[in-house]
Amino acid sequence: MALIHKRQALNSRGVDWSELPEDVIRLVLRRLRLSDFHRARAVCSTWCRVWGDCVSKPNQVPWLILFPDPAQIRRSCMLYNPQEEENVYTIQDLGVDPCLASCGTWLLALFSVLYRKGHFASKAEMMGYPSTDKAVVWIDEKTKDYVVACSWGGDKHAAFCKKGDCEWRQIPPLLGCSDIALKDHKLYIYYEDGSIGISDLKFVTKTAHVQLYPFRFRLGSFSPYDTIWTDYLDWKTNIVITISGDFLMVGCVLKRRDLSWLFRGDQAVILDLGITVQASSDIQGITRNSTYFSGLPSSQKDVFVFNLSSQKVQRLSSSSISSRPFSNARWLFPTSYFTMILFPNIFVFVQL
């Protein structure tokens, strides 16, 4: 309202905001906070048109969604935008079960009922979901086709399903799955012996075909079973897909000052999603050459950004987040419009 009153006052003095060049309006919109950004479309028809062009562009800054603590009576999810450090958006409670994966404006979680925009799921979508150790999801925002893959069990079995499937399709249990990442229809698998497998899930039969790469990846020459195990905390190796489609191995090792990594280029690693994203200097709100964590194996509540260049940990600065208990968190890339209308496009798979 304040912005509208200000516009009316300026118009009374003969100032016509619609006469501003569209490039200037676009620059102004890019510098506004989310709440002011959405109010700006009420200035005039020109501003509304430019605003629409800005909304259609994909969001390039990772947001954090925090899920409520089951012990809390009044439960709600929180959305944190790094561009607005002290602003936290509260949205409806999506349940207290862990979120397994995310893709754009979609979430994959274990619920007793499958919900999307207030409608119950079809029978095909209400499949039994394995008790999973890791899950990944990819969704085509235009067609709404989706692929979900997961790994579970002591032998690290893996399976996947696509939109329209009524049962899980097996991924050959070759060597024990340690980590998985999914981009488009390609599934990347990191096996326990250090080998890498890639499976194209776009055109498959009941069982996926996995192409193994001949090399082995190990973090240095160490194994988790060596005598130096006590020097390591939260040993974990993740496979990450870069912007160009190559795969990147991310080793998480603490209490080892003699080991360090540097990821070159204007990119950042979003470990939740298993991808890298553009992080150039002209994108405010994301730190280049860094890794975004939403929890460590020892603590799912340990959310931070690790800057590989400075070797420093940057924790969330918002007092509203640090003062409120939560069960777990996920990084995601919502669109501006999506975050303002109480989470449409929420997709949840069911455990019956």
From Swiss-Prot:
Residues 14-60 form the F-box domain. InterPro entries: F-box-like_dom_sf, F-box_BR-signaling, F-box_dom, KIB1-4_b-propeller. SMART domains: FBOX. This is Putative F-box protein At5g14160. It comes from Arabidopsis thaliana. The lineage of its organism: Eukaryota, Viridiplantae, Streptophyta, Embryophyta, Tracheophyta.
